[in-house]
Every structure is written in structure tokens, then in C-alpha cells.
Amino acid sequence: MLESHLIIYFLLAVIQFLLGIFTNGIIVVVNGIDLIKHRKMAPLDLLLSCLAVSRIFLQLFIFYVNVIVIFFIEFIMCSANCAILLFINELELWLATWLGVFYCAKVASVRHPLFXWLKMRISKLVPWMILGSLLYVSMICVFHSKYAGFMVPYFLRNFFSQNTTIQKEDTLAIQIFSFVAEFSVPLLIFLVAVLLLIFSLGRHTRQMRNTVAGSRVPGRGAPISALLSILSFLILYFSHCMIKVFLSSLKFHIRRFIFLFFILVIGIYPSGHSLILILGNPKLKQNAKKFLLHSKCCQ
């Protein structure tokens, strides 16, 4: 018999899972239909579609972990499962990073030759960013496969340990390398890009307020809306990364509140940010409304 708080947690996990599948599925379907109609896909749509596919698989794994936690199902821990998990997790992180870079290059206004070069070529660089991410993540997986006996399973064992003590192993150098390669590099790139974008949008908003103070101008709220969207992206991305670091370095009892809270927050990012992307994209928002209206009519 499940305890009441576990039942509530599982219901929240199911809602989170369905929301993540729906929001990311909308992105994939809408962009897929556009690809079939026009025989081509815009760079941003390509990046969003790849990110949405990776998040669907990530959401599936998070829900699988929730089922394991709630119902005490035995987790089959083998090299293949660990490699797939690592690949999906790292690829999603890098694609989200490149999305932040893309927004920064397209929207931010920075007077620097390197930034001007990036702004002019970012659309052409998107396929190479995706390909580079695939190759980089594959190299990380190959590195982990050489240490499959203790490295990747060691990461997963932290999810299912009965103690709360910090892990201490003779693999400190490998752990530091893994942290830098898997978390620090994409996080630093993302932070630089998003902070530049936030400062640029903030400066633009102040200029608009000074220029048109006391008057109503169409589109005046657009920079503020974009700024709030980017800030929410930053908060979700950063909290997602930090919680992954905590789960990688500490042991938790699987049914304690802090562990359940961490797993729930990890799942909020791939579903919550995709919802923000849909609400901020007129094409995706319109198609999502059409889908919901069609679903109501069919009932």
C-alpha cells in the first residue's frame, strides 16, 4: 500500500510526464509538417525539433525513474542502458545551450567583430552545432565506456543508495574531468550567451521607456516578454544542471523528500521550458490551440 505523499508525488510525476510529451510532441509534429510541406526546415525549427526529440526521451527516462522509486521495480543497470541515458542527457544539455546561443546571436546587440560575425552566420552554423554536439557526446560516451565498471554505474548507484554520505572514491581526477566536460563547458557557454542577451534586452527596454515615456507604442511589451522568457529559461536550465551535480555527488535514500523533490525539479525543465517555447512562438502556439480545440470537438 502506497503512502499518501507517494501517491500525490506519482500523480504530479504523471502530469509532468504527459505535459512534457505533449509540449515537445507539438514542436516535433508542427515542424515536421512544415518540413513535409515546404521540403525544408528553418535553422531555429531544426534546432527546436532536435531539442524536443531529445527531451521526449529524457522525459521517458525520468518517468521510468519515478516508477522505479514509487513501486520499487528493479533497475537493470548495464553498460548499454547507461550509455543511452548519458547520450540523451548530454545531447539535450548541449542542444539547449546552442538554443541560448542562437537567441543571443539573433536578438542581442553587442558591438564586437566576433559577435557581428556570429550574428551573420549563426543560421548556417546550426546544422554544424547539432553535428558537433552529436560527435562530442559520442566521445563522452566512449570515454565512459572505458570506465563502465565503476564510472557510469557509480553515477546511477547514487540514485538508489540507502545512505546520505558523500561518495569518496579513488577516481577524483576522472570525476573532475567528467564534471568539466559534461556540465561546466555547456553551462558556461549558456551563461555567457544568456547574460549577454538579458543585458541587451534590458538596455533596449530602458531605451524604449526613455524614448516613449508616457505613451503607448505597439510592441512595447515585446522586449519585456522576451526578457521574462529568457530569465525563466536561465532559471530552469541552471537549476536543472545544479540538481544533476548534486545527484551525481551525493547519496540519497530514494523515498526521502529531498530526493523526490530533486527528481521532480529535473522533470520540470524539459516540460516547462518547452511550454515556454510554445507560448513564445506564434506558429507553435497557434497549432497547439488548434490541436486542443480539435481534441475538444472530438470528445
Curated annotation (Swiss-Prot):
Keyword Oxidoreductase: no
Family from the record: Belongs to the G-protein coupled receptor T2R family.
Example of a GO biological process term: detection of chemical stimulus involved in sensory perception of bitter taste
Protein name, entry field: Taste receptor type 2 member 1
A matching Pfam family: TAS2R
Extracellular-side segments: 1-9, 77-81, 146-178, 244-257
Role description: Receptor that may play a role in the perception of bitterness and is gustducin-linked. May play a role in sensing the chemical composition of the gastrointestinal content. The activity of this receptor may stimulate alpha gustducin, mediate PLC-beta-2 activation and lead to the gating of TRPM5.
Major subcellular location class: membrane
Miscellaneous note of the record: Most taste cells may be activated by a limited number of bitter compounds; individual taste cells can discriminate among bitter stimuli.
Glycosylation, residue list: 163
